Amino acid sequence: METKLVLALIACGVICLLQTTPTEATGKHVQQLMKVFRAIDFDFTKKAFYLHRAKYGVQNQLRNPLYLKAMSLPRSAKLSQPCLKKMIDEVNDLESTFYAGFSFNCHDHDQYSMDCLEAAEPTYLDGLKKLAASTEQCLVQK
């Protein structure tokens, strides 16, 4: 009876070990991505509610999907720095377009109003989703 219990515990330990092995390198990849996302330069002189929405969009539409992808990468994988730099440039372009739609390019509502922000936000979020999908394709250096 005791032998069966020991064998069951050993089998359980081996199964747990096999499940954790592929994720050994995830910390490294996620930390590299964190450094890249910290390089996004938001202008803190802009209105606080605009900045909150812009950061929230980057976090949910871009950063979280890429973190999930990075966590599933093997240890031998290397992140493509040119791809990540291109992503940062495109994020800055999307953010500039979002701000323009919120401020001087808003013709249907008062400039800098919540109505302008809500009108410009779907385009910004869709752009971030598309950027996340394209970045996932080139994330790993070949």
Curated annotation (Swiss-Prot):
Function: Salivary protein with anticoagulant activity. Inhibits activation of host kallikrein-kinin system by preventing the reciprocal activation of coagulation factor XII (F12) and prekallikrein (KLKB1), and subsequent release of bradykinin. Inhibits host factor XII and high molecular weight kininogen (KNG1) binding to negatively charged surfaces. Weakly inhibits the alternative pathway of complement system activation in the host.
Protein localization: Secreted
Coiled-coil residue spans: none
Disulfide bond in keyword set: yes
GO cellular component terms attached to this protein's record: extracellular region
Residue ranges of the TM segments: none
Disulfide cysteine pairs (residue numbers): C83-C138, C106-C116
Keywords: Blood coagulation cascade inhibiting toxin, Complement system impairing toxin, Disulfide bond, Hemostasis impairing toxin, Secreted, Signal, Toxin
An example Gene Ontology molecular-function term: toxin activity
Stated regulation of activity: Zn(2+) modulates binding to host coagulation factor XII (F12) and high molecular weight kininogen (KNG1).
Subunit structure: Interacts with host coagulation factor XII (F12) (inactive and activated). Interacts with host high molecular weight kininogen (KNG1) (inactive and activated).
Signal sequence, start to end: 1-25
Name of the featured protein: gSG7 salivary protein
Main location: secreted
Tagged with keyword Disulfide bond: yes
Recorded superkingdom: Eukaryota
